[in-house]
Amino acid sequence: YKSSSADTMNSKTYPRTNDFQTVYLNTVIKNPAIMVGDYTIYNDFVNDPVLFEKNNVLYHYPINKDRLIIGKFCSIACGAKFLFNSANHTLGSLSNYTFPIFFEEWNLDKGDVTSAWDNKGDIVIGNDVWIGYEAVIMAGVHIGNGAVIASRAVVTKDVPPYTIVGGTSAREIRKR
């Protein structure tokens, strides 16, 4: 997939000549709540990888103040998703409706929004992490340095450094 904006992008966006499926992720991120270390790459053979923020970072609303922090030298495969707190519904309340995302529009106290549901916090990815094809990383998860997330794994809990996990919900396969 060749980016429609390839001619206008910084030449440092694409790490390999004539490969428009892979980007250095920190060159395409605009949201200040998403921090990406040097040399971290994202590959997408389905969609334009420049659109990572739109297509892969989901339910990331500014009102929650949660962040996506990705370390250096990470490899993120096509379709990996990062699901944030706003994807959660308040199972302990009277309604399953997503009232908290409307706090601003309804002029409610925005200071209460994070107490309106179980806010899990930031997603933090260490250095040298490999995230496989269509893996899903849930809100609040911390993945240690050197970890490997298998294809289509759903990661709901922290992953220790240098650990390979896979499955739904992801479980340790072995250390590396």
Regions found by a protein language model. Give the residues of each.
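Short clusters of hydrophobic/aromatic residues that line enzyme substrate/ligand-binding pockets
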Residues: 29, 94, 173
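Flexible, glycine/small-residue-enriched loop-and-beta-strand segment within the central core
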Residues: 34, 41-141
